[in-house]
A protein has these predicted regions:
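Non-catalytic terminal/accessory segments
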Residues: 1-288
């Protein structure tokens, strides 16, 4: 796997360099980078101990013919024949509640691998775009780092107050049309956009019935955290930079944002506003 990892890393570095060099450019050709080695690396990065999806296939079963399975998957992607299966919905307790639950969508193992492969293509672009305040669902960033940054911001503030905002049921209500528009600002590769569209429309199986929501992205999907970060990068972070900052008497910084659900906080002083979020340990995590 070492050679595969090196090859993938080199390609990702090239994507990242181009994204940094051309921050307004939309990438039109990325899917060709996805070869068998890329899928092998995606498989290596995919959790193998999770529950099976609607097809019941486990990692052990898939790995018995891994090379053949990945080549078949790649062929279906390249030809456009890949069909995203429904996710299997289960409900887990929400936070520490004994009454509320959170719906989780469990993709098939093969879907997880392909979603991971697409995330590996998109992350080098969006990691150049995302703001320093965003900590949730990002590689190399943690709840503890968000908490420390939040504490530092509070200590540097001279008075003021903290405003907490809860974006309820964000995953369930994510607007597909707006998400597609945001994606196309940086990605216009037809293969990738069609794959993402298939995942958004794949449907949800629960109690033997399949439904097809016209909004949302299943919690539990490998690509869902990245899609949510892209959406909020434009809707929340972009709004703050574009519309809020210019109306403030003093300049301010969007300091810290932690996504575990979708709750964020704004630290406000007399003339300066910055929004932030800490970690679940401080009970200021975003609750989906």
């Amino acid at each position: 796997m070492l050679r595969n990892s090196t090859s993938v890393s080199t390609k990702q570095e090239r994507i990242a360099a181009l994204a940094k060099q051309a921050p307004l450019m939309a990438f039109t050709s990325l899917a060709h980078l996805m070869d068998t080695d890329w899928l092998k690396e995606a498989y290596r990065r995919t959790r193998k101990d999770g529950a099976a999806g609607v097809d019941g296939v486990t990692a052990d079963e898939y790995e018995q013919d891994l090379e053949v399975n990945l080549q078949s998957l790649l062929g279906r992607v390249k030809s456009g024949a890949y069909r995203a299966p429904p996710v299997r919905r289960v409900h887990i307790p929400k936070g520490g509640s004994t009454t509320e639950t959170r719906p989780i969508g469990i993709p098939t193992l093969e879907d997880k691998v392909l979603q991971r492969a697409v995330v590996m293509l998109l992350e080098p672009i969006y990691e150049r775009d995302f703001m320093a305040c965003s900590y949730g669902f990002r590689a190399g960033r943690s709840a503890h780092q968000a908490l420390e940054a939040f504490r530092g911001q509070l200590m540097n503030c001279r008075g003021g107050y903290v405003l907490e905002v809860d974006i309820r049921k964000f995953f369930d209500n994510l607007d597909h049309g707006h998400l597609r528009s945001f994606l196309q600002l940086r990605v216009r590769d037809g293969v990738l956009l069609r794959l993402i569209g298939k995942w958004l429309k794949a449907g949800v199986r629960e109690n033997g019935c399949v439904s097809y929501p016209d909004s949302g992205s299943p919690q539990g999907g490998v690509i869902s955290p990245l899609l949510s970060n892209i959406f909020l990068h434009y809707v929340l972070d972009g709004w703050f930079e574009r519309d809020v900052k210019p109306r403030l008497r003093d300049h301010s910084n969007v300091s810290v944002r932690r996504r575990t659900g979708f709750n964020f906080r704004m630290i406000c002083t007399g003339r300066v506003i910055s929004h932030s979020a800490s970690a679940e340990a401080c009970r200021v995590d975003r609750r989906g």
